[in-house]
Amino acid sequence: IAACRFLQERLKLPCIQGYAFGFLEHGEPGVEYVKPLDFCSSQELKEDEQMACFEYIFSYLPLWYPREKAYGICETVEGSRRNFCYSKIDSSYLR
């Protein structure tokens, strides 16, 4: 996280997103989403970093999982971010 924050402003959020995607890409098969969601929820991240992180991971869920599994993953997300997760999945499947 600290390394990302030392980058130029325009690169900070993509760097955070890249870390999260690395967790997704190299996660345990079938539960690849657990570590990136934990990372995005980290209290070490600022609010804008968390939002960018979640948005990025949520947008990949429909590419990695069937719709039912993606919705089930959204169920594990806390509070208002759950609806954001659903909206990212719905918009992906409506294309």
Locations of the language-model features?
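Non-catalytic tandem-repeat scaffold regions and their flanking low-complexity/translocation tails
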Residues: I1-R95
